Amino acid sequence: MKEIKTLEEYNALGKEPSIIEFGTPDTCIPCKYTKENLEKFEQNKKFNLTFYQCSDINIITSLEYSSVPVVVLVTPNTKVELTDSSISMDEEELSNWIEQNIGD
């Protein structure tokens, strides 16, 4: 995964479908599971997506995320987020979520 280091880098996303993972703590088991599934999708090139991560607290708070982790899917037409309890998805659920939102 590529690291987003500035807010400008984040704001430039969206021309190509992308997934951004914000602040996934390894101590959160469901979050870690989702992170592992995203990494698997990236390695297997399951989706035509660019994968990013961001752990910079200044960027996270400037985007008004009050809790992490957050997974964001950005396309030229939409931005959808997984937060809080929705972050815990198995591989099939996460795959379905991406498929439902990538073509919008």
Regions inferred by a protein language model and the residue ranges of each:
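Structural microenvironment flanking redox-active thiols in thiol-disulfide oxidoreductases
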Residues: 24-26, 54-61
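Non-catalytic, surface beta->alpha helical segment in thiol-disulfide oxidoreductase systems
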Residues: 73-104
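Acidic phosphotransfer microenvironment of two-component signaling modules
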Residues: 8, 57-58, 92
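Short amphipathic alpha-helix with an adjacent loop that forms part of the alpha/beta core around
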Residues: 10-12, 61-64
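Structural micro-motif
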Residues: 63-74
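Local sequence-structure signature of Cys/Sec-based thiol-disulfide redox active-site neighborhoods
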Residues: 2-41
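Acidic, low-complexity, intrinsically disordered interaction modules
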Residues: 46-51, 64
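Short gly/ser/thr-rich secondary-structure transition/capping motifs
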Residues: 1-5, 51-55
